[in-house]
């Protein structure tokens, strides 16, 4: 009887797959995997950039990580917007003019106007 119920379609076991697959598809907490890279930018490089500011004397690891993550998100956002500009020109390769167009088109990037000149 139990075998017939398990063989039916739509059972939780069939939808989830083996326990290993279900666990692998779930996002892991950052601290659960030792040595996992949490940031794509090298934290030592970000820390060196922060310390290059003469007004900064100390910078904690958490602050460095947050700055690195914010920089990643910023670059991702501007790259996506610039890529949309490239696609409008029927191109796949980003060019400087695509960044200029993205800066002009998106209000959040207004502070960058004139920086690429």
Curated annotation (Swiss-Prot):
Biased-composition ranges, Low complexity, are: 19-30
Matching Pfam families, A to Z? Answer: CBFD_NFYB_HMF
Can you say where in the cell this protein is located?
A: Nucleus
Q: Does the keyword Nucleus apply?
A: yes
Key words, A-Z: Acetylation, DNA-binding, Nucleus, Phosphoprotein
The question of whether Transport is a record keyword is answered with no
Region: Disordered; residue ranges are 1-36
Q: Which InterPro entries match?
A: CBFA_NFYB_domain, Histone-fold, Transcr_DNA_Rep_Reg
Q: Which GO terms describe its cellular component?
A: ATAC complex; epsilon DNA polymerase complex; nucleoplasm; nucleus
Q: GO annotations under biological process?
A: DNA-templated DNA replication
User: What residues bear Phosphoserine in this entry?
Assistant: 25
Instruction: Report the domain of life of the source organism.
Output: Eukaryota
Q: How does it assemble?
A: Component of the DNA polymerase epsilon complex consisting of four subunits: the catalytic subunit POLE and the accessory subunits POLE2, POLE3 and POLE4. Interaction with POLE3 is a prerequisite for further binding with POLE and POLE2.
Q: What is this protein called?
A: DNA polymerase epsilon subunit 4
Q: Which organism is it from?
A: Homo sapiens (Human)
């Amino acid at each position: 009887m139990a075998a017939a119920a398990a063989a039916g379609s739509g059972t939780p076991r069939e939808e989830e797959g083996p326990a290993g697959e279900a666990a692998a598809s779930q996002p892991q907490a950052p601290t659960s995997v030792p040595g996992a890279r949490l940031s794509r930018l090298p934290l030592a490089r970000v820390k060196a950039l922060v310390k290059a500011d003469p007004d900064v004397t100390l910078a904690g690891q958490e602050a460095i990580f947050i700055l690195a993550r914010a920089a990643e998100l910023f670059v991702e956002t501007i790259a996506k917007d610039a890529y949309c500009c490239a696609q409008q020109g029927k191109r796949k390769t980003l060019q400087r003019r695509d960044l200029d167009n993205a800066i002009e088109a998106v209000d959040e990037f207004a502070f960058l106007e004139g920086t690429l000149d």
